[in-house]
Curated annotation (Swiss-Prot):
Coiled coil: none annotated. Zn(2+) 2 binds at residues 164, 167, 186, 189. The keyword Lyase does not apply. GO terms for cellular component: cytoplasm. This is Chaperone protein DnaJ. Residues 5-70 form the J domain.
Length: 377
């Protein structure tokens, strides 16, 4: 099968400069690197092709030969006598590969490896009233803190801390296997990048210790379930003096016994008596600011909703206030006396045939009549 064009493999134009070729190689090598693809044979073959293409196109002489003769320039007896594959083995002839993988994976430097601390999560439950008004809560978190005995060095006082001779402070080691370059945690220093003569007794050389931290968290007014508050630098301590991670406080608002929340609006069910619904009047309803008056028109039915503007929740960022929506439930009287029953019977009799006074009932009965009339046809 004919070999694919090297320029096509890297996805660059034939006139691409060295910078564009290097950039394309870095992107593809990172994508198909064996450490990322975990044994995927197709990706391994792709990685070989990418390395082969870059080995040729990154070298001016080899690229010139390829541009003139194509793949034939590197066949048996061709350019450099590298054999049918065009390579002599290993990465020995790959100019620039060492530098690129150093950039991609942080190798080649004798600097001690620094790793930012982990981000932490804390779930907190608050009441609706606390969510509406805002509150400061004291919390305790389990975290990794800088060891106060060795100040994070991991070494006992007076003990030497040297750069790991195996990984030269990188914390990881690279191995070349044909076209592949793999990187693993240094087996000598276990990724710390350093060699400690006498490890700290308290943290055992890690430089960090498990600790319970107490914090005050200011929760702003208007938060809702699922909102996250980020406390920068309040996560786990970093390794070797690296910055600490962040703490994310996740809000959970408890269900309320009166109100239901939908965004910045509040909903509540308001029961009224049979006579209040029929005659109308003014009732008291609960709001987050206390009691408020609500006017009930004559003839109010169950399910009617009244909107009280601005009586909802004030948004955290915009300052816009939602509404309170009151849903009316008309209560049917129970355990009536004989006298009360007699009065209701008289009322029922007086309403007989008065369609304007019982609009829903009349409409329903008309609909039922039409339904049965149609069945009989």
């Amino acid at each position: 099968m004919a070999k694919q064009d090297y320029y096509e493999i890297l996805g660059v134009e034939r006139g691409a400069d060295e910078k564009a070729i290097k950039k394309a190689y870095k992107r593809l090598a990172m994508k198909y690197h064996p450490d990322r693809t975990k044994g995927d044979k197709t990706s391994e073959e792709k990685f070989k092709e990418i390395n082969e293409a870059y080995e040729i196109l990154s070298d001016k002489e080899k690229r010139a030969a390829y541009d003139q003769y194509g793949h034939a320039a590197f066949e048996q007896g061709g350019f450099g006598g590298a054999g049918a594959g065009g390579f002599g083995g290993g990465f020995g002839g790959f100019g620039g590969f060492e530098d690129i993988f150093s950039e991609m994976f942080g190798g080649g430097s004798s600097r001690q490896r620094v790793v930012r601390g982990d981000d932490l999560r804390y779930d907190i439950e608050i009441t609706l009233e606390e969510a509406v008004r805002g509150i400061t809560k004291d919390i305790q978190i389990q975290t990794l803190a800088t060891c106060d005995h060795c100040n994070g060095s991991g070494a006992e006082k007076g003990s030497k801390v040297e750069t790991c001779p195996t990984c030269h402070g990188h914390g990881r080691v690279r191995r070349q296997q044909g076209f592949f370059m793999t990187e693993t945690t240094c087996p000598h220093c276990h990724g710390t990048g350093k060699k400690i003569e006498k490890p700290c007794k308290k943290c055992h050389g890690d430089g960090r210790v498990h600790k319970t931290e107490s914090l005050s968290v200011k929760i702003p007014a208007g938060v809702d379930t699922g909102n996250q508050l980020r406390l920068a630098g309040k996560g786990a301590a970093g390794e070797n003096g690296a910055p600490a991670g962040d703490l994310y406080v996740v809000i959970h608002v408890k269900e309320h016994h009166i109100f239901e929340r939908d965004g910045n609006n509040l909903y509540c069910e308001v029961p009224i008596s049979f006579t209040q619904a029929a005659l109308g009047g003014e009732i008291e309803v609960p709001t987050l600011d206390g009691r408020a008056k609500l006017k009930i028109p004559e003839g109010t039915q169950t399910g009617t909703m009244f909107r009280m503007r601005g009586k909802g929740i004030t948004a955290m960022r915009s300052g816009y206030s939602g509404d309170l929506i009151c849903k009316i439930t008309v209560e049917t009287p129970v355990k009536l006396t004989d006298e009360q029953k007699d009065l209701l019977h008289k009322l029922e009799a007086s309403l007989e045939g008065k369609t304007t006074q019982r609009p829903k009932s009349s409409s329903f009965l008309d609909g039922v009549k039409k339904f049965f009339d149609n069945l009989g046809k």
